[in-house]
């Protein structure tokens, strides 16, 4: 056992736990052992060099001895030593070559091992960093999540506390209310003041209770917000789970990739093992050669010893020489055995190195598995932690839900109790609300009518949308049909020129439109600026008018104050007069006059107040007019913005149309390139065919020349014809070389173009990256601006809500004050009633004093003054209330303007987003261009690979030619003397080395072919991945488009809600104005009643004065006074009634205001909920947009990685090419060496006969040409099969990808329809909620119950929405799963059997869909099912026939191979037989002269020849039998072809019937579509008339767009039948969309007028859809039939190829039979001609030899020592031609001594005897 044979232990690795230091030490030990092995190999090399030097020295010494003393033994020894030296030199060279190769191989493997170790270290580091980062992020996430949970818990606790406090306060207030109500009901002895006070307290407590309930609702909303935050936290946890799963999947993918690389390294190690085995085989061959050489030398020695023993001519010196030669031979044998041992050591060391590498790889794999196991364990632990935390969260959420439900139930119970108490309170007020109920009923009737009208309007809108959808669907279907039916008919050049001209015209018009748009934008801006200036001026005017009103109001207040002061003075004077009764009555009269004067001034003030009120009403009317004007201006602005948007959309459509044109041009260029590639392939095929024809002609010429050389009696005319043919062939060959040079020039130009394209691609990629960066920056800016705007909006909304709350509280406080003042008035009226009763008692008693009367009058006057003050205070409050309302209006107007600006800002952002989307689409188009260029590059690279393959084939041909030359040299050397045996052996060795090199070269070419196949497979895989990514991007584009549509719909809903809010605000203003008018009327009535009271008071004063004057008169005046008092009391009662009516109206007003406030709060809550929903949707859309961007970036990164991998592969391929070039150079150098060696042997060629050389050369050429033909034919067959197989695979893959794309499109359409249905369902739910709100407004008595129902319905709707969102998420997950399934199916498409199975499954799916769709039309379903069943049967039959055909084909191929192998064997046998016959004939011709006694051997040879003839005849009969079998198989194949043709005819007949049916159906459809188009034209004409009446601008723009469409969109864009060359990548690029958009806008304006016309055409549209569905089904059937026909065409091509191959094989067999017959005829003729001549020549030769022997024996009687040279039996190629009569050795007979001549003759006789004995033994 050597040190290298020891195996390294594996146990310490597991004991130490896979220590890296231990591995390094182990690796160093392995390196040391390898170094020791290298040292041993170096020592072996030195030994070989020493042996070579020793041999050279021996040769020199022997040559020196020969120069001094010539000796024949020395010559033989020198030759043997030279041969051994050459052999050792060759072995040394081979050894160095193998050593270098193994060193390079080991270095490569070491580099790979180092690379993988570095990669492992990097992976470990990345894994550690990844785990640390993920766990760090996870810890942060856990801490953040715990903080959030704590915050949520704290918020929940706070909210619970606040709810408890509010409940306590509500309970306390309710208790107080109940107490006060009980006191009012039970204590009837309470005074009016106490009752009023209790009622006031009850009202105050009721208001507080209302406020507390509002606070409670707000807390509930916050409670829901916290719950939603908890749900979002749960969603974040789920996202974390998903990210962990994704990271785990990515790590698994990386591990799988490295495992695959390790497997590749193991495969490389196995290949090196195989190479070592091959080298061992070569060494064995060499050892066998050496053994053969030694055995041959031993045989020679045995011959010598036998001859010495037989004749006793050998002396002792010769015996010593023989012993010395034997010793040398044994030494050489030992040396060879030592070399064998050294080579075996090398092999063992290499095997040990390989085992060591395998062990290291195994350890490496185990380490990887351990790391993977640890990582998976850590991941599982983290996942378990996350799952436990997730479960805890879910538990907390459940507990929170239970608590929230319990709290909600408690709240509901409390609310029920409150409702019961409120009902009790409301029952007290039901009597006063009868009139209000009547008004409410009338309002309900009106609202129901309004609701019915709205429902009718919504139904009409819904029907209109359905009709629009149907029409859009029909238009799309029509477009698809037109694109599928029509094809491009005009030429490319003319179309391109026309497109360029149209593009210039369109560009000019577009520039004009852009200028017009700029002007229009400037005008809009100016108009907006003017409008804002007008608004500011009007606001200034309003402020000025307010200031003037305030001034007048202050003046009135001052005047009232002065009047009050005067009244006070008069009252003081009156009191002074009462004290001083003795004053004169004149003063009383004076005071009465002043009192009257004051009353007149008071009347004037009242008139001024009425004027002031009139002025206020005028100002309010003007304000209303200005407000209406502003609304009109706003509407005009909206119309202008809509027109601007329309023009912008038209510009975008034009741009999209331009993009579509450019894409179409690109596709046309791609078609041109494809045609160019096909033409180049056809040209190359034609050139190859011409080369083959020329080769065949050359072979025919060579055959003709051979016939000329054989037949000396041919005519000279044939020579001339052959010369002409050779000249024509030369010219054709020159033309071929010129064409080849042109092709090479073309490929050089194409490579240069590829380089230019690559540079352009890189530049474009850089531009795309910059564009993406700019887009990202702009998107970030826009998102920031949006966030800022949304924050401002939220702040403004919050401020608005606060202001609104404050104003509502102020209104409530004003109402309370009014109620207090009303109560005070009631109290004062009660006091007045008491005083009047006292006065009546005083007047009745007649004994009361004047003092009491005067006191009563004084108290009445003071109370009247108090009443006037209170009235003035009330007026002030009313004015303040009006001012508050005006300020509130201003704020609302300001907020509405802000909302309008925000809506405009949103529109601008939407336009910017649309622009960005167009830029993205342009980028996608550029990516498509790049993809096409990549395909072109790929094709060109494949062409380059094919070129290199051809070059390799040329090199192989050159090597074959060199081999032919060497074989020629060998044949020439074989015809030389027997002394050149060693040279022949050297040539045989060189030939063997060349064969080994050729094998290595073939292996290199095979490895290149494998690499080429791998490259093609990789390119196919990448091609599929690019297609998948392209499909994903298209799907994402569609999803983005759908999301944009949803966003537009949401914006429209928001605008509708704002409009509803404005309408509600207007209704609120109207109701408020009505209530203010009612209050003003009440105030006027009160003023009138006050005026009447004042008049009556004046009359009473006058009556009292008269009473003073007429106290002493009779009681007649008293009767009048009593009557007046009674009238006063009646008026007082009427006043009380009026005051009661006012109180009732006040209560009604309070109720109305409360109901309105509750409605406003409900609307506010609904708006808040909707706002939350919209915010969530916006966040979802943002996240989806970010995901799309991330996916785009990933796609770009993957593309970069793909480009880098492609470049690396190209670099590797170039490196391999360089290596091949180096190998070529080495081969050339060795060929040069061989040529130099061959020059040394040229001297021997001159001695050979020219005739034999020519014949041998021609025969060798024939054989080589035959072999070349066979190899070329096999290569061509292989290439054709590979090409056709690849083409068939590519076509089938394309078709299946088309089908799968169509199925995926259908699935996406179905999903989009489901999404639209869900959106409609959501809209229906929103409409139902609106109806419920309206129903809540109808019933005020059942308001609370309905409120609960509304809340429950809203919660249910939210739950449903969440459920639907979950369903949508599930659908999206299903879509993602389906995507993954589709990707997996794409990866499995490369196997043909699975392809056939999938085609069958797709057919079955199509049949099922056809069955599901055609249930409505049963009769047509039956027809379709019959057709489908027929196609199924035919498909099954075709598959069975295909399998039978493939089996027959395989059998034929196997049979052909067997026949070829048998033919080759027979040819080789015939060659050997011919060679043996030729050798025998030559030997008989040379030896028959010497031997008369051995005529029987000649007779035996004749018998052997007869046996050979019989064998040949048997072989010929056997070949005839095989030919008959071949003919029978061909006949069977023809019968199968006939059956296939008959079945194809049947299928074609059925296809024609189907096409006729489809054409009839299409005609009917076209007629119906023409009718509908006429009706649509009529509708469009009507719409255009209305449009002309409404706006002139729209008509101008529409006319311009129509003219542009006529100029810019000729019917060329509608004519396209190919699915692959689809001109419009997106449906909104289609030019017909403009007309549809304009018609949709017109329909929105005139829905009511177009409803009846649309209802007429619904039935016809449904029929069209049904018929179109039938047409689509039939078209699908036609596509299936086209696929079947394509497959049949492929089968026909394969059959044609088979027929061609069979014909070629028949031709070859016939030619081969002809050649065999010709050879047999030649042999028979030669035998017949030379049968007699051979005998005569042999007798003559024997006589001559005997004479020479006798003559020489007489001259030299002593015995002669013959120089024996044993003839080596070497397989020589000897041609069937008669050797000339004069032998070769007679030419040098004079220079040789007589003894030598005798020895030679004896040697020849002995050799002939031996040969005869050997053949007799055989």
UniProtKB/Swiss-Prot annotation:
The gene is hmw2. Phosphorylated mainly on serine residues. One of its GO terms (biological process) is adhesion of symbiont to microvasculature. Residues 31-880, 919-1607, 1644-1755, 1786-1817 form a coiled coil. Component of the cytoskeleton-like structure which stabilizes the shape of the wall-less Mycoplasma. This cytoskeleton-like network of accessory proteins containing HMW proteins 1 to 5 allows the proper anchoring of cytadhesin proteins in the mycoplasmal membrane at the attachment organelle. The keyword Coiled coil applies. Keywords: Coiled coil, Cytadherence, Phosphoprotein, Virulence. This is Cytadherence high molecular weight protein 2. It comes from the Bacteria.
